[in-house]
């Protein structure tokens, strides 16, 4: 589950490898709701095409989501089963993505009591700076 080698991932690999070879920076961007943080330079690697809930096991409290999935879509899916995440990330109304929320770690005031979103991530599949697919963790049941 998670990241399969689809056309989007292959295109990202080519973009990453091209940037690496040319020495050009890349900036990973979903909805762009956090573009005002820091200095955003480089060609955009857009995650919005990599969306969707890959799997959802409500009885196990486990969901696998792609990085470009809007946070609001994840919340709606969980809400259908009377489930929720204990986070209130900013910029949801502007289309914040799951990848952006996890990457920024901005999960709202409840963090003091429930922890950060990264404390709830069981695993991740990602591409490194060489365009290699790396897999960390996984589902625990």
Which residues does each PLM region occupy?
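Short, charge-rich amphipathic segments
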Residues: 2-20, 113, 118-130
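Glycine-rich N-terminal segment of FAD-binding domains in flavoprotein oxidoreductases
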Residues: 3-92
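FAD-binding subdomain of flavoenzyme oxidoreductases
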Residues: 94-141
């Amino acid at each position: 589950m998670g990241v399969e080698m689809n056309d989007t991932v292959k295109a990202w690999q080519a973009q990453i490898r091209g940037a690496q070879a040319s020495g050009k920076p890349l900036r990973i961007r979903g909805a762009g709701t956090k573009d005002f943080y820091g200095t955003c330079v480089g060609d955009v690697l857009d995650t919005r095409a990599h969306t969707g809930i890959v799997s959802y096991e409500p009885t196990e409290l486990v969901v696998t989501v792609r990085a470009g999935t809007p946070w609001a879509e994840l919340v709606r899916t969980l809400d259908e089963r009377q489930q929720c995440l204990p986070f209130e990330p900013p910029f949801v109304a502007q289309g914040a993505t799951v990848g952006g929320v996890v990457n920024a770690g901005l999960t709202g005031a409840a963090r003091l009591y429930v922890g950060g979103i990264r404390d709830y991530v069981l695993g991740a599949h990602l591409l490194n700076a060489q365009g290699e697919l790396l897999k960390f963790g996984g589902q625990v049941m």
